[in-house]
Amino acid sequence: MDFISELKKRNIIKQISNEEKLALALKNQKGVYVGFDPSGESLHLGNLIPIIVLRYLKKVGFKTYAILGGATGLIGDPSGKTSERKVQDYEKITANANKIKVQLERYTQAKIINNIDFYQNMNLLNFLRDTGKLINIGYLLDKEFIRSRIENGISYAEFSYNIIQGHDFLHLYEQYDVQVQCGGSDQWGNITTGIDMIKRKYGEEKTPYLCGLTFNLLLNPNGNKFGKSEQGALYLDENLTHPYLIWQYIYNQDDQFIIDLIHRYVLDQSLEQLQELIEAHLANKKTRIAQKFLADYLVKFIHSQEHLDTVHKMNKALFDNQLDQLSDQEKLVVFASFDKVELDRNQSFMVIDFLLQAKVADSKRILRELIAQGSIQIDDLKITDPQAQLNVRKDQQLTVIKKGKKNYFIVVWKG
């Protein structure tokens, strides 16, 4: 199976400007690039599709490039936005780009270039003369993402973004023999601008490999962008998102959607190999074979086997009722999505008063009944005496209360 058919079968490709040129670009080992926006300090789970596809394209024979938007990030891409993006300062974009560069070096196996290098020594007059002349205003006004913003207002900076990204493609074409640009489905307008600028400068006959392709937007069954939990984006930086949260997010995806995710994310295994896994999953959905496979796969890919081992340890502690095996920090991660009550560690509590303030039940009568039934545990210890004094260590960050088999209540200690 050729690589285009492979990516289509996996539901990755949305649009290709010219399939014949794309096949020729591979045959002649031309360059392909994907751009990465440094508006945040880390890549997130949604960025993994272009990263994994870039790795795949290198494997099949393309020369691959990852372009950091150190220049374009200073303006902000208006694609898919209904209002003006907040401008970030140079220092912040530069710091973000440096952090993301480290991630791209780890994940992409591509040559990494910051597009700020294209513009630092360029003056405005040369840009308008050499690049601005390649595009007319009518062409830009026909772009859907610009047309949709005209009525509500769009700054000249964001209006010009399309030309600047087009110039990126032109520069890479001239300096690195990059013939293919890839991006999310919202990048189609920017990609085609670059193609048209290069064709206008060099002509159709001299651009036999020039093309672009976009990836299908990854939406969950509710129609929301995949890669965002209730707590926000799931970052690849473990200091921003603990690997356990990524594992849990993947593990909790529904049975049909997880199949689509496996097809898109696991490009280092053939569709035939993956089909065996999927059939085993469909034969016994309760075991969640597919969810566990992809959760393990992505945590190991993003982080390491050691991180995955820690995630497994945290899961085991939770399900085997051995939370004492975890540090307070690990407990905070495990219960990140749970509601929490803050209490003063310097305050003295009897167990029943503590449970009432932790909102385990609405009354002391109900709490006494639960304790008599053996249904209350505090930090893995079964409670038998509602009048006992609660002991809190000076360095203790939280207390975990378990009611019954599955209901948890979290108290965070302050003071």
Curated annotation (Swiss-Prot):
GO biological process terms, semicolon-separated: tyrosyl-tRNA aminoacylation
Checking InterPro entries in the record gives:
aa-tRNA-synth_I_CS, aa-tRNA-synth_Ic, Rossmann-like_a/b/a_fold, S4_RNA-bd_sf, SYY-like_C, Tyr-tRNA-ligase, Tyr-tRNA-ligase_bac-type, Tyr-tRNA-ligase_bac_1
Q: Where is the S4 RNA-binding domain?
A: 350-414
Reaction(s) catalysed (UniProt annotation): tRNA(Tyr) + L-tyrosine + ATP = L-tyrosyl-tRNA(Tyr) + AMP + diphosphate + H(+)
Q: Where does ATP bind?
A: 228
A Pfam family matched by this chain, by name? tRNA-synt_1b
Motif 'KMSKS' region covers 225-229
| UniProt GO MF annotations | ATP binding; RNA binding; tyrosine-tRNA ligase activity
Q: What is its EC number?
A: 6.1.1.1
The sequence motif named 'HIGH' region is recorded at: 38-47
Explain the purpose of this protein.
Answer: Catalyzes the attachment of tyrosine to tRNA(Tyr) in a two-step reaction: tyrosine is first activated by ATP to form Tyr-AMP and then transferred to the acceptor end of tRNA(Tyr).
Q: What family does the Swiss-Prot or TrEMBL record give for this protein?
A: Belongs to the class-I aminoacyl-tRNA synthetase family. TyrS type 1 subfamily.
On assembly, the entry states: Homodimer.
Protein name, as recorded: Tyrosine--tRNA ligase
Q: Which organism is it from?
A: Mycoplasmoides gallisepticum (strain R(low / passage 15 / clone 2)) (Mycoplasma gallisepticum)
